[in-house]
């Protein structure tokens, strides 16, 4: 008889955020990637090493609810909670994408108490590159 392999841990009941808690990070970069379907918030140090991340999907939202501003707000709060505990005081914000969670994530970051040195929009804009997808007919 083959014994079933027990699951050690899963993302659902495991940790949220960073595994290393001993590092002190006074300054960092917060990347917000807001698409129409999801919002991903990644917090890195100034060298670009990921400290913490969260998305609307890992915050408990499924399906079409992941693209909402409220889901983006809770993803930003989850990502920032761990780095505030590690001592982050100043940050730069890079926002990418056209999604509805852009402003909500930025509002949640401002409310967290971290001083923002600047907010930069790094949405990639084509200089008439690839042909866009056809218009939807509903």
UniProtKB/Swiss-Prot annotation:
One of the Pfam families matching this protein, by short name: Ribosomal_S11
InterPro entries registered for this protein in UniProt: Ribosomal_uS11 (IPR001971), Ribosomal_uS11_bac-type (IPR019981), Ribosomal_uS11_CS (IPR018102), Ribosomal_uS11_sf (IPR036967)
Protein name, as recorded: Small ribosomal subunit protein uS11c
Protein keywords: Chloroplast, Plastid, Ribonucleoprotein, Ribosomal protein, RNA-binding, rRNA-binding
Gene behind the chain: rps11
Biased composition regions of type Basic residues, renumbered to the chain: 9-24
GO molecular function list: rRNA binding; structural constituent of ribosome
Organism: Lemna minor (Common duckweed)
Primary site of residence: plastid
UniProt keyword Ribonucleoprotein, yes or no: yes
Family: Belongs to the universal ribosomal protein uS11 family.
Source superkingdom: Eukaryota
């Amino acid at each position: 008889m083959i014994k079933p392999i027990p699951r050690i841990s899963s993302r659902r009941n495991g940790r949220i955020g960073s595994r290393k808690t001993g590092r002190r990070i006074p300054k960092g970069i917060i990347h917000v990637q807001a698409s129409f379907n999801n919002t991903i918030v990644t917090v890195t140090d100034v060298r670009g090493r990921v400290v913490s991340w969260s998305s609307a999907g890992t915050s408990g939202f499924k399906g079409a609810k992941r693209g909402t501003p409220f889901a983006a707000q809770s993803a930003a709060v989850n990502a920032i909670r761990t780095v505030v505990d590690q001592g982050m005081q100043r940050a730069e914000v890079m926002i990418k994408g056209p999604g509805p969670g852009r402003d909500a994530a930025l509002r949640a970051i401002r409310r967290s108490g971290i001083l923002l040195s600047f907010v930069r929009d790094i949405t990639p804009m084509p200089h008439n590159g690839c042909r866009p997808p056809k218009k939807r007919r509903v």
